[in-house]
Amino acid sequence: MSKPKRERSLAENEAKAVARMLRVSPQKLNLVAQLIRGRKAAAALADLQFSRKRIAVDVKKCLESAIANAENNHDLDVDDLVVAQAFVGNGLVMKRFAARGRGRSGRVYKPFSQLTIIVRQVEAEAAAA
């Protein structure tokens, strides 16, 4: 016996991928996520390829995973995919200390983030508009 299947939270023309434990602050990750929101998947991949941000490599990997999920798991056409949503969440925060003057210490926060990308298949006419 197994658990009953859970209802699919996405529409039939959508697929998603989640990247967790990304070692960057959510604020910096959101700058890169804003680049790809609402863009066609191929254009978003090209933008990430030539972005100078360090975290763009991990965002590109997550987007490629979402595209692969759409193609292999949900039988969607890769050429008609659009980045419907790209949102950032908080992860854990490692707390470290740095030595300061006069024998004191200061806190250093090392934040982690998570990224969720949802791609949606749209018709060719709607994507061109």
From Swiss-Prot:
Please name the taxonomic classification of the source.
Bacteria, Pseudomonadati, Pseudomonadota, Alphaproteobacteria, Hyphomicrobiales
Q: Which species does the entry assign this protein to?
A: Bradyrhizobium diazoefficiens (strain JCM 10833 / BCRC 13528 / IAM 13628 / NBRC 14792 / USDA 110)
Q: Which family does it belong to?
A: Belongs to the universal ribosomal protein uL22 family.
What gene name does this entry carry?
rplV
| Superkingdom of source | Bacteria
Tell me which HAMAP family the record gives.
Ribosomal_uL22_B (MF_01331_B)
Q: What is this protein called?
A: Large ribosomal subunit protein uL22
GO MF, one annotated term: structural constituent of ribosome
GO biological process terms on file: translation
The record's subunit annotation is: Part of the 50S ribosomal subunit.
Q: Which UniProt keywords apply?
A: Ribonucleoprotein, Ribosomal protein, RNA-binding, rRNA-binding
Q: Which CDD domains match?
A: Ribosomal_L22
